[in-house]
Amino acid sequence: MKLTIKDIAARCNVGKSTVSRVLNNDPKVSVQTRERVQAVIDKLGFQPNQSARAMRGASSPVVGIIVTRLNSTAESQTLSMILQQLYAQNIIPLIVESQFQPELVIRHFALFRQRRVDGVILFGFSQLSLEIVQQWRGSLVTVARAYPNIPAIYYDDENAIRTLMTKLYQQGHRNIAYLGVNDQDETTGHDRNRSYLAFCNSHQIPANLVEAELTIESGYLQMPKLMRKPVSAILCASSSLAISALKYLQENQQNLPLACIGQNVLLQCFATNLLTLDFGYPQAGKWAVELLLTQLGGKTTTEQRKVPVNLS
């Protein structure tokens, strides 16, 4: 016999409305109650009646996608693959921006609950706490940042920097400057910065690290500081910062080899000495949808996948 919300409520000794709120990720439900009800739902493999979806006017599943910035070259590559995979499954995307603001994520979550979306793909960032993220546990995948017991797709930041540094070192460079991101950013900033410094230390070459915000303008403004020391090559934490470096070098009639994480077709057209690394952005998008569909299919998972990197 097919289980109903009433059956779940009886087994948990709560009201039907409480079960409904858990299914809709209502933040007003206490953590203890949510976990108790979710445990019964997972154990019994309960799935809500799909007729409820039709009553709300949605013939197809809806997935909310929260990117940090729609103008991000990196995230747009991941988003493009996410959309391709969702369209293939007849799933409707609802795309919003967080702009690195936890408050906006909370507002978007409220919107998703109002729209009764089926699942969420969230591009994480350092300021976003686990407390906020776990509101959608059970129908959520994070991208770029991993959280405990939450399905996630994350990047191999440390190995990416180490791979590029190794290649530049093999080419004979010993004064490799690094245009990085503020350490408060755990992935693009902290992890990549630490990897650069560790390589310099292990290979006994001088470190020249300058931090910028993750924008072209900020990177450009930090370039004079980076160039105060001898530089034979410049490694950048992102393709946008590589554009900053290229702009500065061209304006000052300097020609130095550049390297960066990620691929930017326009940048590659103008930077002849560019070494890039395929960070696996499309693969991340494909895997994110896979993990979300697993959950929407009624299965519980906390799988976290690290995307491999490859020199272009």
Task: Locate the predicted segments by residue.
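N-terminal helix-turn-helix DNA-binding module of bacterial transcription factors
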Residues: 1-60
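An alpha-beta-alpha
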Residues: 164-203, 299-312
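Flexible loop/turn connectors
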Residues: 225-233, 238-312
